[in-house]
Amino acid sequence: MPRARRRLFLRRFSPGSLASMTPRELVFLLVLLFLGFLAPHWERRTGDFLEGVVTKVVDGDTLVVKVEGELRRVRLIGVDTPETVHPRKPVQYYGREASAFTKQALSGRRVWLEYDVAPLDKYQRHLAYVWVERPARDEDAVRRGMFNAMLLLEGYGRTMTIQPNSRYADLFARLQTEARKAGRGLWGRKR
């Protein structure tokens, strides 16, 4: 930038000169500030993958993941495992097995979080698909590398679609049917 233009820019946008800005310049500055505040939250809306480490497994479908120095309580999208820690419900059939499977598979492990449309639930938990391999969106990659799908395939949970987070709902329904037909997990035992 030429020296004369640089001085003009610095003079126009120095802290003491806000009052002398034109309305157009003020709007431009406000838009820049607004975009700067939104930037950390874009990752939740774009479907990008965030890398983190599982620091705690709460139960079969809820984890705590450390992402960029921040601990996030994460609820897996599209799958519901039987309860083990609900304050008003007893431990449900196959709940201990689902929790043990999740702990064994994810405790201390590097994972990738994939957000869908709504990033948080009413309890302020992050809603995500959790990948244990580098993510890809083809069906084979989902079966092999997405933990939500693994829970369904192994019969540790049932599908649960809460709109608008339904990116993999059709595939998850097929995976549950496959587990049920094969008698895996909670589909294989008599109560």
Give the location of each predicted region.
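Small beta-barrel nucleic-acid-binding modules, primarily SNase/OB-fold domains
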Residues: 1-191
